[in-house]
Every structure is written in C-alpha cells, then in structure tokens.
C-alpha cells in the first residue's frame, strides 16, 4: 500500500518523462485489449449460462436489440356483470356469479337420475326464465335467469322442456335436473341442450364424453365421482355451490354465447369506432402518445404501455385478436363506466354492442380450430417483439394454445422472426421519412444532378475526346490549327494533302 501512495505522489514527475508516458499508453492499450479478448473468449458467457441454466427468462432475445415479450390479459373484471364459465373436467362445469361474489352455479353431466330424491317436482314454466318454484336461494336468480335464457331459449327457440324437474324444499338450495333423453316437440331437445352448453363452455367435445356416479346426502348436497367412460349423458344437474376457484375461467365462452345469433347468420358489420386512447401517468393525468393497460387488466403487476404505432395498426387492420381484445377494454373503460348503468342494463348494452366491437369470424375460426385440435387463440396471452433501445413494439399476436397449454416459442419462430424484420423495416422507413422531411428539396435536386454530372464527366474522361489534328510523323503542331488538307491559315504549314490524324489534348 505504501508503494502505491509513493507512486501517486511521484506521478507528476513520472509523466514528465516521455518514456514513462509511452509505457503508460502501452499498458492501458494492453489492459483494454486483454479485457476485450477475455470477453470474446467465452469464459464469461459460459459462467453466465451455467448460472442461469434451467431458470425462467424474462424474455427471449432475438438479436442485440429485439426481445420477444408477452402480455397476459385479465379479462375477468371486464365482464363483472356476466357469469363466467369454466370446466374442471368433462363433467363438472361452473358459472361464477357477477361482481366478485363468492357463490356460483355447478352444472354436472351424469347418467344417474335424481327422480327418486325427495321433494322433486316438475318445473311449472320455463318461459322467460320463470323458475319461481325452484329458485329458493334468493341470490342466484340473475345468473340462473341468464343461464336459462342463453342456454335454453336463445339457442333452442323453445319455451319449455318436458324433462325438467327441480327441488322445491324451502332453504334446501337450488337443484334442477334436465332429462336429456326426453324429446320435445322440436325433436331431440336434450341433445341440442348439451350442444348449447358446449358452446358456452368452449369445448364441444367435453359435453359428450364420460359419466359420473352421484352420492346425495339427506341435506340435499350431491357429490359426483368416477367421471370417466365413453357414453352419452342422460341428465344435466344444476345446483348452487360456493365459489372456491374450482377452475380457471375465461369470459371468451360468454362472448361466444353472446355472438351466437350473429355467428350463424350472414351479417356484415363495421367497426363501431376508432381508438381514442392515450397514455396516463401514475396520477391518472392523460399524456398523449399511446395507450397503457391498467394494472387490473394484466395478470402481472405494473403498467404495460403500447405506442401510437401499435394502436394505428389496430385502427387499420381489424382482423387481429389483440385489437378485438383492446376494443373490449376500451368499451369497458368508457361506455359502461361513463353511463353508470345497473347490472341488467350493462349486460344488455354489452350484448348489443359486442358484435360491433369484435370480429365474430375470428371467434368462430378459433372455436373451429379448438374443435379440430389445431392451435387456437383464447384471447388471453399475446406475444410481441420489443425494441429494447427505442421502446417500440410490434403489433401483438395471439399466443396460440393446444390441449390446454401454450405453445413453445420454437413452434412459431418464423412468425416472431418476421415481426422482428418488419420492426427493423418500419424503423428504417421512419428514419428515411424523417431525413426527407428535414432536407430541402432543392438541395436534394442539386445533389442528384451533381452526381449525374460527375458520373458523366468520368465517362467522358475515360472515352477521351480528340481535340486537334497532328501531322503523321511530326510533333504537336500547336498553337497552329491544321485543316483537313494539312494546311494552316497563317502559312506555316504550306504542303497540302499530307496525312493527318486526330489526337487528344496533351498527346
């Protein structure tokens, strides 16, 4: 340590010596070059790889500045007023009550009848959702009415089902049984009822496979086990239950049901409006320049912002799932919040407006892909290419699913490489347009024509234009200018008809 202090104290004297300065320069160059070589040799990269191997990465780096990122949307709050469905398995399906309630409705497909159970009677009327003699809970009325209307009437266009029975005991809770083997005047209503249920659930195969054994206690609670096998169901059991996160639910099934009437008819639609979003800071003040998803709208904590370029693409191209989802967010933020409607009016407003907000062809296309076991979109997770230097994003694309799980990044490598290339092209095009806007047109013209002039002169210089005549075998006649007869006007060259030739200047 003392040697270092002594060296620092004598540093001014050392620098005075030229040889010492040269040694210092060489030492610095060697150290810097050694560090560069050490970084390029791969030892540091190997150590980083071994430390991070097997751990989750925040993003997949495509190149030095582009990163593959994703955003996972939380659509549940958007449809607080609508029941949201999910499936635990092929036989147990659930509906969550609106506005964050802790109760729900359980739908179970089984081959075991409850007709022998006490206090079961035929439902008086299913017209307009009238189940007053069945609904003894006093809390599931709105959800159950919506379920019956959408599941039964809007799909089947009938007002009764002769095989429907319910429990009428006071305080015993909700218990409704559909006998799916009994036909109505319209034919196999029960089978169509199951198909309608499959539309809401989102998996057309789930409603047709398996069977369950029921175990009912004296207090009216039924448990269903051994849900397996390959047979058609005979009964649909509807009962109230507590909401304990039985399964992860998605509102896209509800959207599919809301689009049911439009989905199977040839109806041309136009987008209701363009995006009017802007960025908001932490205090809620609007800052023009893009759109930020609030914390409730995404699965992970924080704010995710997309610039105006992404929103402009959504205004231009309507055939993208991400843009449809953003329209739903925009509608939820502005329409329902501004109008401050009650629950039932909000449901009606959403059902009427949803056909102008999202593309029903996309919903149907993804439903068909799911049915055909082709990777499909569930409108929840979207990937995009992020420029880590400029902060620009590509238009997010849906992260496809297969068999209930998201595809690996390698399955759509060509897609995100293409988006990365498009992002580079857009950046270069924008820089070119910016430069064009800052450069005067006259200066551009001068530069262009000067380049043309320079190229022409180079060509002429290479060709070599002859400038004067020479007498063959003699020196340069300048300053005399010889005619074609080898004569000069001044009389210096007097012998006519001598052989001449054209030569360049300086020859």
Curated annotation (Swiss-Prot):
Glycans are attached at residues 89, 111, 179, 240, 378, 386, 403, 408. A lipid is attached at residue 2 (N-myristoyl glycine). GO terms for molecular function: metal ion binding. Zn(2+) 2 binds at residues 468, 470, 476. GO terms for biological process: fusion of virus membrane with host endosome membrane; receptor-mediated endocytosis of virus by host cell; virion attachment to host cell. Disulfide bonds join 86-247, 292-305, 314-323, 377-398. Residues 2-17, 59-445 are extracellular. The record marks 33 as: Important for GP-C-mediated membrane fusion. It comes from the Viruses. The chain crosses the membrane at residues 18-33, 446-466. InterPro entries: Arena_glycoprot, Arena_glycoprot_zinc-bd. The record marks 58-59, 272-273 as: Cleavage. Residues 34-58, 467-507 are cytoplasmic. Zn(2+) 1 binds at residues 57, 480, 488, 490. Keywords: Disulfide bond, Fusion of virus membrane with host endosomal membrane, Fusion of virus membrane with host membrane, Glycoprotein, Host cell membrane, Host endoplasmic reticulum, Host Golgi apparatus, Host membrane, Host-virus interaction, Lipoprotein, Membrane, Metal-binding, Myristate, Transmembrane, Transmembrane helix, Viral attachment to host cell, Viral envelope protein, Viral penetration into host cytoplasm, Virion, Virus endocytosis by host, Virus entry into host cell, Zinc. One of its GO terms (cellular component) is host cell Golgi membrane. Belongs to the arenaviridae GPC protein family. This is Pre-glycoprotein polyprotein GP complex. It comes from Allpahuayo mammarenavirus (isolate Rat/Peru/CLHP-2472/1997). The gene is GPC.
